[in-house]
């Protein structure tokens, strides 16, 4: 399941783009129950970094923990375990959000005329360009009509890809 690029991307976002998170997940999957201290030692990563990743995963409900109090020291020990059965639903939800955003962007591209400042590389709607007299508000340069056919084509490709994933990928077919 973790080999799926869409799942990897969502997990990467959840873990604030920290690649160590995948190592943490691997340790959790391979040991099934482990303390944050043991993960830190196994990966040779600072304990606070391991805890930060575990908390992010916990917020997404992808890990669970048990807390036990040491009666001698009064310290708590947290034992973490993976809870990856929620991954497909989480990825499907994020994919739907992305898909909706792409569809909104496609509608915007298809229903508007755009202008472009080649110096600043900024794209403006016709209304915004007209309001500024077809001069770039950043640099004052002339704006030129922008052909967004490639943008529309790219958006359609991305939408089709995600829709295909929903229908063809068995991980997401239930969502």
Swiss-Prot record:
For this entry, list what GO says about its biological process: regulation of DNA-templated transcription; transcription initiation at RNA polymerase II promoter
Which key words are in the record? DNA-binding, Transcription, Transcription regulation
Q: Does the keyword DNA repair apply?
A: no
Q: Can you tell which superkingdom this protein's organism belongs to?
A: Archaea
Entry's Gene Ontology molecular function annotations: DNA binding
Return any one Pfam family short name: TFIIE_alpha
**Segments forming domain HTH TFE/IIEalpha-type:** 3-88
Q: What start-end ranges are recorded for coiled-coil regions in this protein?
A: none
| Record remark on domains | The winged helix domain is involved in binding to DNA in the preinitiation complex.
Q: How does it assemble?
A: Monomer. Interaction with RNA polymerase subunits RpoF and RpoE is necessary for Tfe stimulatory transcription activity. Able to interact with Tbp and RNA polymerase in the absence of DNA promoter. Interacts both with the preinitiation and elongation complexes.
Q: Which family does it belong to?
A: Belongs to the TFE family.
**PANTHER family listed in its UniProt record:** GENERAL TRANSCRIPTION FACTOR IIE SUBUNIT 1, TRANSCRIPTION INITIATION FACTOR IIE, ALPHA SUBUNIT
The entry's function note states: Transcription factor that plays a role in the activation of archaeal genes transcribed by RNA polymerase. Facilitates transcription initiation by enhancing TATA-box recognition by TATA-box-binding protein (Tbp), and transcription factor B (Tfb) and RNA polymerase recruitment. Not absolutely required for transcription in vitro, but particularly important in cases where Tbp or Tfb function is not optimal. It dynamically alters the nucleic acid-binding properties of RNA polymerases by stabilizing the initiation complex and destabilizing elongation complexes.
Protein name (database record) = Transcription factor E
What is the species of this protein?
Answer: Methanococcus maripaludis (strain C5 / ATCC BAA-1333)
Name of the encoding gene: tfe
